[in-house]
């Protein structure tokens, strides 16, 4: 993942929002709360953080990158959480593999926007060019 993001950042403007510094990243690393003022396209692969995507008022596009089904680890999953992540109209869905497409589309009643394996450079470029 880090290698792909570093390669992508060489030719595209790229920011990473993180709770801590990531020394091996060769791009802008900012604290997570800075995402609330970010006016570009934002992708998160964290289910917890995806719940905040609809609150990011300045974002041009919001993507939830589903690599794993994190929500299955919760004991109780209120509908409002699903509504604010998988079902929210301003959040586009990206999945890790083609095997996930049917399940996620049935669960969310939305089309999966991209299939992106491990932060694939070609898909990141397509998203940047949208």
Predicted regions, residues:
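N-terminal pre-catalytic "stem/leader" segment of glycosyltransferase-like enzymes
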Residues: 1-38, 107, 124-130
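Short, polar loop motifs at secondary-structure junctions
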Residues: 17-22, 45-51, 96-102
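Membrane-proximal helix-turn-helix segments that form the acceptor-binding/catalytic region
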Residues: 30-37, 76-93
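Short N-terminal targeting/anchoring amphipathic segment
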Residues: 32-50
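Active-site proximal beta-strand in glycosyltransferases
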Residues: 41-43, 56-73
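A short, active-site helix/loop in glycosyltransferases that binds the activated sugar's phosphate group
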Residues: 52-53, 90-114
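Short hydrophobic/aromatic-enriched beta-strand-loop microsegments
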Residues: 61-67, 111-118
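Short beta-strand->alpha-helix junction loop in the catalytic core
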Residues: 69-71, 115-126
């Amino acid at each position: 993942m880090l290698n792909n993001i570093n390669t992508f950042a060489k030719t595209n403007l790229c920011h990473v929002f993180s709770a801590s510094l990531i020394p091996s990243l060769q791009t802008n690393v900012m604290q997570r709360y800075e995402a609330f003022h970010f006016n570009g396209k934002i992708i998160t692969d964290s289910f917890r953080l995806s719940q905040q995507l609809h609150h990011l008022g300045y974002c041009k596009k919001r993507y939830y990158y589903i690599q794993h089904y994190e929500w299955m680890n919760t004991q109780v999953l209120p509908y409002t959480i699903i509504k604010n992540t998988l079902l929210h109209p301003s959040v586009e869905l990206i999945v890790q593999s083609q095997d996930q497409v049917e399940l996620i589309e049935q669960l969310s009643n939305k089309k999966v926007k991209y299939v992106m394996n491990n932060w694939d450079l070609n898909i990141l470029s397509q998203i940047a060019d949208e």
